[in-house]
Amino acid sequence: MFRTMMRAKLHRATVTEANLNYVGSITIDEDLMDAVEIVENEKVQVVNNNNGERLETYVIKGERGSGVICLNGAAARLVQPGDKVIIICYGLVSAEEVYKQIPKIAVLDDRNQIIEMLSAEKAGTEV
C-alpha cells in the first residue's frame, strides 16, 4: 500500500504577481524550490490563506533570489498580489517508509525569504 504524504511545503509565501495571460502554472523562485526539493513541472497544491481557495497546478522556475511567487493563467483569478499562500507538494510513500519520510518545510517572511526550516509540524502551532 502507498500513502500520499506531504513531502515539501512553502509556508506563508506572499503572492508577488498574478498573470492571467500566461499559459498556466505557478512561478516559484528557484532558490525556494531547491530549499524544499520541488522540481520544475512538479504538481503542487496552493492554499490561499486570504480567501480559502485551493488549487492544483504545476511549477515553473522563477529567477533565483527574486522571491517571485506568481500564479499564472486561470489560477490568477484566485489570488491577488499580497495574498498569503501555502504551497504543498505531496509524494507517494510505501507503508514501510511512512514513518521514515521527513518533509521539508520552509517558513517564509513577507519578502519570500526563508526564516526557518522545519521537518515537522506540531498540532496547533502558529507561525
Swiss-Prot record:
GO terms for biological process: alanine biosynthetic process; pantothenate biosynthetic process. The active site is at S25 (schiff-base intermediate with substrate), Y58 (proton donor). InterPro entries: Asp_de-COase-like_dom_sf, Asp_decarbox. It catalyses: L-aspartate + H(+) = beta-alanine + CO2. It is found in: Cytoplasm. It comes from the Bacteria. Its cofactor is pyruvate. Pfam families: Asp_decarbox. Binds 1 pyruvoyl group covalently per subunit. Is synthesized initially as an inactive proenzyme, which is activated by self-cleavage at a specific serine bond to produce a beta-subunit with a hydroxyl group at its C-terminus and an alpha-subunit with a pyruvoyl group at its N-terminus. Pathway: Cofactor biosynthesis; (R)-pantothenate biosynthesis; beta-alanine from L-aspartate: step 1/1. Gene3D superfamilies: 2.40.40.20. SUPFAM superfamilies: ADC-like. One of its GO terms (cellular component) is cytosol. Coiled coil: none annotated. CDD domains: Asp_decarbox. Its EC number is 4.1.1.11. Belongs to the PanD family. Catalyzes the pyruvoyl-dependent decarboxylation of aspartate to produce beta-alanine. This is Aspartate 1-decarboxylase. The gene is panD.
